């Protein structure tokens, strides 16, 4: 599973750990990703999405259909990458 939100397109960032003596070592800042199931009324099926917390807020605000259409239009996901359950 890639660490990319399917709604917002956010990815893990790369930065530095900085110690008390200011030595820098590379690290990754991971997203708050989780898999969430939604009932997609237009297709009459359940779908599973890999979302970050901000992506879930966007779905709550716009609705599932509008959020998916925006994500596909912006190139963050395509209809083939959306997992259909049942």
From Swiss-Prot:
Pfam families: Ribosomal_L28 (PF00830). It comes from the Bacteria. One of its GO terms (biological process) is translation. One of its GO terms (molecular function) is structural constituent of ribosome. Keywords: Ribonucleoprotein, Ribosomal protein. InterPro entries: Ribosomal_bL28, Ribosomal_bL28/bL31-like_sf, Ribosomal_bL28_bact-type, Ribosomal_bL28_sf. GO terms for cellular component: ribonucleoprotein complex; ribosome. Gene3D superfamilies: Ribosomal protein L28/L24 (2.30.170.40). Transmembrane segments: none annotated. HAMAP family: Ribosomal_bL28. Belongs to the bacterial ribosomal protein bL28 family. NCBIfam families: L28. This is Large ribosomal subunit protein bL28. It comes from Bacteroides thetaiotaomicron (strain ATCC 29148 / DSM 2079 / JCM 5827 / CCUG 10774 / NCTC 10582 / VPI-5482 / E50).
């Amino acid at each position: 599973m890639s660490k990319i939100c399917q709604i917002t397109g956010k990815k893990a960032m790369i930065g530095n750990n900085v110690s008390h003596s200011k030595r820098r070592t590379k690290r990754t800042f991971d997203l708050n990703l989780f898999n969430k199931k939604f009932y997609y009324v237009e297709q009459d099926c359940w779908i599973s999405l890999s979302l970050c917390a901000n992506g879930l807020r966007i779905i709550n605000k716009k609705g599932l259909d509008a959020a998916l259409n925006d994500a596909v239009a912006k190139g963050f996901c395509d209809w083939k990458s959306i997992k259909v359950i049942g």
